């Protein structure tokens, strides 16, 4: 009888707060469960350098390569901590899937840039490494994002009803899982990104812990309406987005400077919730259950905004109710994609990205 296999997934999202590593167990292409997690926060200096690369500037090529190496050393450290916590050796792991750190996402030009020195990561970890997952989908005419709907479908689909899965990272994205049709999904718009940027600019804090600052503010209806008028929200899916559209300087074009900082933050929370509600109402009108993952689930103000928007129409749940910690989901997805690569299984959600066909995502690097 063939033994089961262990994989590690490493993910650092658009919130740029750090790197998550998750250990999963597979039986060939069959998911058996997630078994461990490690997290390494980004030092402030690293985060600032990554944010600086979001905009064009001098010496970009050199800076991006140096940051790729720095990130890969941090990723290797995170993987080592995970192995240590599980009493495992690198030789126990079949493959490691690494997403890298997105610094540019331009599907209209058929490219998306995730920083990671994958050969260095393979060398540092002594584990076969799979990465650069988005490029293959882009080559087939897709958006390169979101990639997680195929993983959500493999784990969370129900044969009796349509489910929605909401990931709230820097960008929010939904996966729609019909019982009798392929999964699809798309980016709904900003998740935590604008709230985090506002916190950094006005409180010098990386995020609004427990929604404490937003809870002190009031929604500004006129500002909310102006934000919701962005043409991205009227575009049909498949679609994806990032900081290129929804950066702090975009928000500031709608402000006169006299707004209370707490009120703006409160409005940004409702903005995220409203765009999610509008997307689900349009694309998954028959969904009655929505399972939530990502960092946004820890913000009670945002969760209350979602509950108010959806009312009794859709029940909101954590993915923990489906046996996967909401903080582990994205990293687990890239471990699963590494397993798909090893087993030559197409892992791309082409109905979500708009690619012409299902693809085996990623490129592999031996140590």
Curated annotation (Swiss-Prot):
A GO MF label: phosphotransferase activity, alcohol group as acceptor
Any one GO biological process: amino sugar metabolic process
Pathway: Amino-sugar metabolism; 1,6-anhydro-N-acetylmuramate degradation; Cell wall biogenesis; peptidoglycan recycling
Key words, A-Z: ATP-binding, Carbohydrate metabolism, Kinase, Nucleotide-binding, Transferase
E.C. numbers: 2.7.1.170
InterPro entries membership: Anhydro_N_Ac-Mur_kinase, ATPase_NBD
Enzyme class, spelled out: transferase
The keyword ATP-binding is annotated on this UniProt entry: yes
Residues the record lists as binding ATP: 13-20
Keyword Transferase: yes
Signal peptide start and end residues: none
Catalytic activity: 1,6-anhydro-N-acetyl-beta-muramate + ATP + H2O = N-acetyl-D-muramate 6-phosphate + ADP + H(+)
Function in brief: Catalyzes the specific phosphorylation of 1,6-anhydro-N-acetylmuramic acid (anhMurNAc) with the simultaneous cleavage of the 1,6-anhydro ring, generating MurNAc-6-P. Is required for the utilization of anhMurNAc either imported from the medium or derived from its own cell wall murein, and thus plays a role in cell wall recycling.
Alphabetical list of NCBIfam families matching this protein: PRK09585.1-3
Family: Belongs to the anhydro-N-acetylmuramic acid kinase family.
Protein name: Anhydro-N-acetylmuramic acid kinase
